[in-house]
Structures are given as C-alpha cells and as structure tokens.
C-alpha cells in the first residue's frame, strides 16, 4: 500500500501563522488603488498588522526597505503610480522584503498589463488575483470584465503554475474555491461567502493580508493559505449576522479581528476547508 502524501500545507502551520501575525504586528506598505485604501487599512488593522500607504515616487523605494512587507495593487494606475510601484518592487526585491502583486483587471487593458508584467521581473513573493487576471498576466487570456473574472479558478491552474515557475513565488487564484500553487504543490481553499463579491475592496484587502502573512511566514504558500483561510472564516462568521452588503462589510472587519489562532485551529479541525 502506498503512503498517503502529506498535505501541502499542514493545518497547524496556518494557526501558527495567525498567532505570529498577532504577535509581530508587521508593517505593510500598501501601494494600492484609490478605491480601496480605507477598507484595506482597516482589514490590516483588524488582523493585527500596521498599514502604511506610502505610495509616492519619492518615498516608495526607501519605505520598501524598512517595511515588513509590500503590497502592489495596480487597480487605479497612472504613470506616477506605475513608477512608484516599480521602484518599490525593485527595492523590496533587493532588500528581500516579501511583496505581493495584485494584477487588478490585467489582460484586457494594455497599459496595466504591461506594467504588471514588468513587475514580475522583481520576483513577487506571491501573485494574487482572480482567474482572468492570472491568465492575462501569464499571457494565456484576454482578461475579464473589468475587475470581475470571466473564468473559473481551475481554468487558471496551469497559468498559475507557469507564473510560479517564472517568479519563484506562490500564485493564488481566487474563485468559488481558491487555488494556490508553489514549488510543485497545489492547495485548494474553500469557503467564504458570496457577499465578499459585493463588498468593494474585499479582494484587494485579501492581497494586503497575504502580504501581512508573508511578513511573518517564510513559506509563501503557507502565507497565502493563511490569509485565504482567515478571510474565509471571517466572511462566514460575518454573514451569519449580517445579511446585506453594507452591514456585512462592517461585520467582516470585526470578524477579521475576532478570528484568532484558536479559531483557525478549531475551524480546520472540522471544516474540511483545505484540499
């Protein structure tokens, strides 16, 4: 009888990552889009991290050297933002600061697609996007409908693996079931709630949380998985007491704060969330 293959991400590692985030309060530099700055900062604060929206061309590189992690989100892009993002990513790469690329709406628009592909040269620790964005970034698709995906996560698995090989980092594809890949490993994370898709900035906040976890966890697959699990548990708990988008958004931030390492551990013992 053949031995059962070990799980690519042991559940105890995710609970340990949650505890580490709380204990270490990483400083996360966010070069993110103007639509989502408030919810992104609030999500980081709720999770126990410290946000810093240092995104100008004069300071982005210097701050990336002292930050615990960096988020680069190309959602609202112009020439100055693109330059600041490039400088921050290069600085993070040189300083070995973990950084996350969120290729918002990449694939269908030439400018942001070129900028995002250029950023890959700075070896992001994690790329996090929906299926259409990952396909577009890898050159295997033409993008989705704006920020919304027109493809399922499973359709982007091979593109994600190719991006992971190219960058050396993990790639996380969001969907009904999220698919995460790195170094020959593939992990699926289920759960969450449909109200996340009706909350402006929920996905962008997830990218910031991936960065926060990458600051306290050296394995990029574990870091990405910890963020996805944290967000999913918080969303399910929020939806249990808030049935509409406005109240859900507030409840979700509350639950990001409430979900601690013990909650992660208890959930993973019974939920079957990981596959």
UniProtKB/Swiss-Prot annotation:
Substrate binds at residues 53, 201. ATP binds at residues 128, 174. InterPro entries: Hyethyz_kinase (IPR000417), Ribokinase-like (IPR029056). It catalyses: 5-(2-hydroxyethyl)-4-methylthiazole + ATP = 4-methyl-5-(2-phosphooxyethyl)-thiazole + ADP + H(+). Its cofactor is Mg(2+). Pathway: Cofactor biosynthesis; thiamine diphosphate biosynthesis; 4-methyl-5-(2-phosphoethyl)-thiazole from 5-(2-hydroxyethyl)-4-methylthiazole: step 1/1. Pfam families: HK. NCBIfam families: PRK09355.1. HAMAP family: Thz_kinase. This is Hydroxyethylthiazole kinase. The lineage of its organism: Bacteria, Bacillati, Actinomycetota, Actinomycetes, Kineosporiales.
């Amino acid at each position: 009888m053949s031995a059962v293959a070990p799980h690519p991400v042991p559940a105890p590692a995710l609970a340990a990552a949650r505890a580490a985030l709380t204990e270490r309060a990483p400083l996360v530099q966010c070069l993110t889009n103007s639509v989502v700055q408030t919810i992104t900062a609030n999500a980081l604060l709720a999770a126990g991290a410290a946000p810093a929206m240092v995104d100008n061309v004069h300071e982005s590189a210097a701050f990336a050297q002292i930050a615990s992690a960096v988020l680069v989100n190309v959602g609202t892009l112009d020439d100055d933002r693109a330059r600041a993002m490039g400088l921050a990513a290069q600085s993070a790469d040189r300083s070995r600061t973990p950084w996350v690329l969120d290729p918002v709406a990449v694939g269908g628009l030439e400018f942001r697609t070129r900028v995002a592909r250029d950023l890959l040269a700075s070896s992001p620790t994690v790329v996090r996007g929906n299926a259409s964005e990952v396909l577009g970034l890898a050159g295997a698709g033409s993008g989705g409908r704006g920020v919304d995906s027109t493809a399922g996560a499973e359709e982007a698995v091979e593109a994600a693996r190719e991006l992971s090989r190219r960058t050396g980092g993990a790639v996380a594809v969001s969907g009904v079931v999220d698919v995460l890949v790195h170094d020959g490993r593939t992990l699926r994370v289920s759960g969450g709630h449909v109200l996340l898709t009706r909350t402006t900035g929920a996905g962008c906040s997830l990218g910031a949380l991936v960065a926060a976890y990458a600051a306290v966890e050296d394995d990029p697959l574990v870091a990405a998985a910890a963020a996805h699990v944290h967000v999913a548990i918080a969303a399910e708990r929020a939806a249990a007491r808030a049935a509409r988008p406005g109240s859900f958004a507030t409840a979700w931030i509350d639950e990001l704060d409430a979900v601690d390492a013990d909650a992660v551990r208890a959930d993973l013992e019974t939920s079957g969330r990981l596959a």
